[in-house]
Amino acid sequence: MALEPVRFAVLGPVRVERAGAEPVPGRPQERALLALLAVRAGQPVALAEIVDVLWGRRPPDSAVNVIRRHVGTLRRLLEPGLPNRAAGRWLIRDAGGYRLAVDADSLDLLRFRRVRDEARRLGADGRESPGRVVALLTEALGLWRGPHVAAGLPEEVRERAGFRAVDRERPAALRDAADAALRAGTPAAVLSLLRQAAADDPCDEPLLARLVLTLAAAGHEAEALSTYRAARARLADELGIDPGAELRAAHATVVRASGTTAPAPSGAGAGAGAGAGAPAEAEAGTGAEPGAGTGARTKARTKARAEAGAEARAEARAEARAEADGPAA
């Protein structure tokens, strides 16, 4: 008699599919145990780690026996009719703990990694077109049913390192997809994914930088500029910081690409680059004449204000032109 296939999903809420039905573990600890074994993707999880995840620093004396009961319940959920104490096919005793016997066909996390790794391999060898890389990465990202692995579990469980590490795999793949789409000249292929990711985590600067660049490349120049302004305000309000170098560079790229590059401040010329380090050297007191530091700092502030004003005017012209052109097709 053929065994019924079982599929596990953790890229979003934890799900199990068997024979067209979706049996749900009844107890929160059973769901947490199944999720922990799934995010470890076929690797054994020691009993001590399971105890720590389920109870933290104050486990009951009966913790190991409770885990064994949870394992038995999960085994019968996955394989109805399984005799008591039988190991079954999926939840295996292994290396002083337990292992979920899964592969890329039965677990969405492993399937995501398989497709993502194939895309990265093709991108690294340079022989495949960027468009193919984009297609594979968007296929992999499409397996996620939300921004977080094992969504719905208690936060104290999801804060564990194994869950957080898997959470980081999604934005990393999305950054790769955005970069490949920009190289391929197909920004629209990832735009909705980037918009959703920015809504899920509005302070993720690397993703915001790619959203700004992708919006502009897709013809949404005004939205790219307004996205940067909103991000800058949010970072200041929520974190008390200015945009980092990557996000600032993305914004500057959009302004330059608009054809209205900010002009150099008055007096700046071929020698401006050579003097760029002067304020820092003057403040450090290395080789500067007395009083030179004040003059250098004043000159630097004047230059910064001039550049900021010129960039603001260039940005306004870029936004006006984008709005006049109307939305991209």
Q: Locations of the language-model features?
A:
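Generic start-of-chain signal for non-secretory N-termini
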Residues: 1-11
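Intrinsically disordered, charged and Pro/Gly-enriched terminal/linker segments
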Residues: 2, 23-24, 28, 39-42, ...
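A structural micro-motif at secondary-structure boundaries
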Residues: 10-31
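DNA major-groove recognition helices of helix-turn-helix
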Residues: 16, 30-37, 50, 67-81, ...
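Positively charged, aromatic-enriched patches within helix-turn-helix-type DNA-binding elements
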Residues: 16, 40-66
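Residue-identity detector for glycine
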Residues: 267-277, 285-287, 291-295, 309, ...
